[in-house]
Each structure stands twice: as C-alpha cells, then as structure tokens.
Amino acid sequence: SGGSTYAKEWKSITIATEGGYEPWNLTLPGGKLSGFEPELMANLCQRMQIECKLVVQNWDGMIAGLNAGKYDVIMDAIVVTPERSKVVAFTQAYAATPASFIAVKGSLLPPSPTVKLHDDEKEIQAAIAPLRAALKGKTIGIASGTVYTPFIDKYFKDIADIREYNNSADAILDLQAERIDAVFDDITFANTTLSRPENNNLALSGPLMSGPIWGGGEAMGVRLTDPDLKAKLDSAIQAALADGTVKKLSEKWFKSDVTP
C-alpha cells in the first residue's frame, strides 16, 4: 500500500456539501441538511457501518478544504472531469443528469422519455432526428462553456441559429420574450425553472438525453491518498445502484431517473 504504514479504520467520516443546490442538497429551516445527496449519503453510511457527519462548505473552497484535511469526502453534484481528477480521486458515479430542451408548451415537440446516449453517431442521429426537424430555422439558446454547448453546436448549428448566454436563466428570459425558440440544459435547471409560476407556459420538449455522452457523471471526491476510503464508498454506491435505492431517491428528488 501507499505512504502510510497502517490502513485507516474509517470508523467515522466528515462529508462536505454546499447545502444550497436544490434538489441535490439543501438546508432546511433549523439548519438540517436534506436533498438527494444527504439522503443517499445516510444510506451509504449505513451500508458501510460508518458514522457520518455532514458539514456545509462553499463550492469555491471545497476541493482545497478536502486536500487540507478539513473533511474526508466532498459531495456536491460534482461532475467528473479529467482536470478535477488530477487533484481528487472520484468514486463511482451515482448520477448522470439528463438534459433536454425547454420551449413554450405546444410550440415544438411534446416531452418524451429518457434516451441513453453513448459515443455512437448512429444512435445520436436517430435520437435527435425529430428535434432537428422541429428546430429547423429556429433559434436555440445555450449557456456558454457547459458540457452541452459543443453538442448543440455539433448537431444543430447547420439547421438552427445558436445563441450563447452567460447562463441559462438569461436564455429563459429571452425564450419568454420570444427572441429564441428553445433552451437546452440539464434536468435540475429545467425542473427548477418549470416549477416557477411565471414559467407555467413552458415545458420540456423532446426526449431527456442521458448517458456517457455528457462525460463521467456526478461522483464524490476523496483525497488521492485515501484509496481505501474510495473503495469502501465505491462498493456501497454499487450496492445502492443495484438494489434500486439510488433510482428511488432520484425519482423522489428529481421526478426522473438520473442513475448513471
């Protein structure tokens, strides 16, 4: 084994989350943490028979705090990227958020079920053919610098006008002002947006697209020097995926299946 001469027992661990990123994690009146991730973590800790303590930490300093030893695990809808994998060790993914178009109800396509997309050109083309037909000559709004931006450019630029925004909330304002016809983002953003009374004229349009096409999914981070803790978490996540626990919590909090 690595640098340490003894294996750590891991009788208890401290997990940092933001506590303000609904429905992943949120803080209830009175200070208790709730949401998809805290409920999943409680289940995983039971499986591992480890005592768990959740602490609140801003996303900005989260990775630095982990590596400084302030806590042992970070859990905050963190998407696995090659860049981040250089500084933290990621567990197996417990979610892979699907994405969809949002449009004015009845303007494009009705919402349709989830399709899992891999890096397979034929599969992608088949899934998006109805969307391409519906969006021909229209304008699509997308936040710049997301995992979805290159996808929209690659598959829709030839038939639609693509407009980039600082964030998806600005794109929604333009959708309501009829300057654009659709906005593309993940289901977390979509559900939050659609739950607001002022957006009751909007709906999802076309399929929810999920799967490896969006990268590594959401996972927990641990220090690179704690492979034994990563292994414990991995087997607990695997078990929770296998017995339907993650799916059940996902449907409770996201109203859809976000399992990887």
Give the role of each language-model region.
Residues A42, Q46, E51-R132, L202-I213:
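Acidic, polar ligand-binding/catalytic clefts
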Residues P38, K53-A64, Q125-I128, I162-A177, ...:
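Short helix-initiation/N-cap motifs at beta->coil->alpha
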Residues G19, A96-S100, I187, L194-D234, ...:
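Periplasmic-binding protein-like
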Residues T5-I78, K86, D243, S256:
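Extracytoplasmic small-molecule ligand-binding "clamshell" domains
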Residues D60-A64, A77-K86, F151-Y155, A169, ...:
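A ligand-binding cleft/hinge motif common to bilobed small-molecule-binding domains
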Residues L44, L66-N67, D174-Q176, L233:
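Hydrophobic residues within well-ordered alpha-helices
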Residues P38-M48, K105-A126, K138-T139, T146, ...:
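Extended ligand-binding regions for polar small-molecule ligands
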Residues N25-L28, M41-I50, P110-E123, I128-K138, ...:
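Ligand-binding cleft/hinge of the Venus flytrap
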